[in-house]
Amino acid sequence: MKEKSQIDDIDRSVYDIRDEEHDAYRMQEGLTPAIVQKLSDEKGDPAWMQEFRLHALQIYNEMPLPDWGPSIEGLDIDHIATYVRPNTKMQNDWKHVPQDIKDTFERLGIPQAERKSLAGVGAQYDSELVYHNVKDEVAAQGVVYTDMESALTGEYADMVRKYFMKLVTPHDHKFAALHGAVWSGGSFVYVPKGVQASIPLQSYFRLNAKGAGQFEHTLIIVDEGASLHFIEGCSAPKYNVANLHAGCVELYVKKGAKLRYSTIENWSKNMYNLNTKRALVEEGGTIEWISGSFGSHVGCLYPMSVLKGDNSRMEFTGVTFAGHGQNLDTGAKVVHIGKNTSSYMNTRSISKSGGISTFRSSVVVQKGASGAKSAVSCQSLMLDSESRSDTIPAMDIRTRDAAVGHEAKIGSISNEAVFYLMSRGMSEEDARALIVSGFADNVSKELPVEYAVEMNNLIRLEMKGSIG
């Protein structure tokens, strides 16, 4: 009889909750000008956004699919519903959210997290936010945290128009163009000059609909001398058809400002996660990326930082766990433009049961970026002989005094370490899970404690059945 381990106490079903679909509106599948026009009408877009969407669709139709990275041949946009509106309007009081949707988010811990440690929460269900709230003390500082649709047509409409898809343009790649055509939902954040937002904000994205896509847009502007920590969570139940996530994140870090952007992605194993994230950092500014990627069938995610200002800096800390049937192609990019800029990438990748984990790094030091410093470190842990781990670095250095380095290591779990932990009373499965959690502590130690616990639980879930 198999010994019961601590891992057996972790239940995957909390993430695989499937609500019965009671959509107020579901767009027909596929992607045509008529569908994009109808989506725009449904959302009440201003004229410039409607024109933007149709132009992005034209770019999408003209651009080829990427000829590198994991295969996405199982994804057919003709069988994806690009817009699914839930059966509720956005609420700022949790008790007014419909019970079935509320039950899902409560099982995922969203209300508890808000009460314990968050300054504000946005919760998106399929294509629209169903809940958004910011604490009074944060709003009193002048911090703006609202849904993108309200920002698009309200007080901050001019700011949205100035920044929307200027950093990630529809010409960037085919799925950026798709996003520009059918985006819906997401969050708008503005932190005024000099404001230190000491408590994190969070957005949580849940895709419940079968055969649908989620295309939220996150736009954050941290003004001069200000600071913010923003946390993003994602999940979906598993279906036997493809789902698509092609969100977009644009971050503007002004002079002397600091932004930490943390993400824990736990998409279901039928998800194609083709997300695009980018930050523009001005003089003396800092962008910190914290990234944990655990879900999706195919994942392509490479947050990019443009260090435009002198003395600007970037840090990327990430962990990726690829299990059975997963091909996760992740990494980070940085472009050094200003003088005396610095970047550091510290990543860990774990693969088991035939999973494929690929780390891509891109470091570009432009001609005028004198004194640039960049270091890349990638460590990989393979848990069996069927799995695969690749590291693909790219460097383009155009100044003579740059200091750039890359380090990559690959290894497996030591039998001696497992034996030692078992001698202290652990089961073999728990011992292996503890070692893997320790390997990924580069990310967990950077998260607030509630999210570090959640990440370690996800690792323990992935480790179920890793022996025998």
Which residues make up each language-model segment?
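N-terminal amphipathic, basic helical "cap/leader" segment at the start of enzyme domains
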Residues: K2-I10, Y25-D172, A176-A177, N346-S349
